[in-house]
């Protein structure tokens, strides 16, 4: 019996490590469907708190990914007895290495910048981290519903309704008449006002 679950790719491994709240949100999705308002309040609060902590946890989790992903890749390839099972983990390892290198370059380059420039950059980074954390929580807490295509008959009825409503005159304006008029009648209508 084939599995219907989509395989987890390398970027998903990386994002699941760096944003652990998205894994938790996907587990809590059925409960969030029952209580959407409470879930939104909790998700907003969690996104704000975790977003502020992202400036500290992001580099730490990227460094942890340099050790965790190769080990998971080796174990996965040994369990499945094929080498392509570890390709997602290798990509996640390179993403962790690249992210950590960008963070180190950013910190080293901040030494040469003026404090008036560094503090707004930190503020923008915190805002982006909070926004991304809220986005990750929300998209995994409330997954998109599958859209079923409607029948051609319903689409045809909808388009005919739209064409009828767009060609109808605006009856709220008293100067517009619903009957076709001659040029003399239209001039007499303007003379009244």
From Swiss-Prot:
One matching Pfam family: DUF5422
Region Disordered, annotated ranges: 158-193
Topology of this chain in the membrane: Multi-pass membrane protein
Alphabetized UniProt keyword annotations: Cell membrane, Membrane, Transmembrane, Transmembrane helix
Protein name: Uncharacterized protein TC_0274
Transmembrane segment boundaries: 40-56, 63-79, 86-110, 117-138
Domain of life according to the entry: Bacteria
Family of the protein in this entry: Belongs to the chlamydial CPn_0442/CT_006/TC_0274 family.
Localization per Swiss-Prot or TrEMBL: Cell membrane
GO cellular component, one term: plasma membrane
Chief localization: membrane
Organism from which the protein derives: Chlamydia muridarum (strain MoPn / Nigg)
């Amino acid at each position: 019996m084939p599995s219907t679950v989509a395989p987890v790719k390398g970027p998903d491994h990386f994002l699941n490590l760096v944003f652990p709240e998205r894994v938790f949100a996907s587990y809590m999705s059925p409960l969030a469907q029952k209580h959407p308002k409470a879930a939104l309040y909790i998700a907003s609060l969690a996104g704000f708190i975790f977003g502020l902590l992202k400036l500290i946890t992001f580099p730490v989790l990227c460094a942890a990914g340099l050790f965790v992903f190769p080990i998971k890749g080796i174990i996965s390839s040994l369990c499945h007895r094929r080498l392509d099972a570890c390709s997602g983990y290798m990509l996640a390892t390179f993403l962790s290495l690249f992210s950590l290198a960008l963070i180190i370059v950013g910190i080293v380059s901040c030494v040469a910048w003026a404090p008036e420039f560094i503090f707004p950059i930190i503020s923008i980074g915190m805002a982006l981290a909070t926004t991304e954390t809220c986005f990750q929580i929300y998209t995994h807490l409330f997954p998109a519903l599958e859209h079923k295509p409607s029948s051609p008959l319903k689409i045809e009825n909808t388009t005919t309704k739209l064409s009828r409503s767009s060609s109808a005159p605006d009856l709220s304006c008293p100067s517009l008449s619903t009957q076709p008029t001659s040029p003399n009648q239209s001039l007499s209508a303007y003379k009244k006002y």
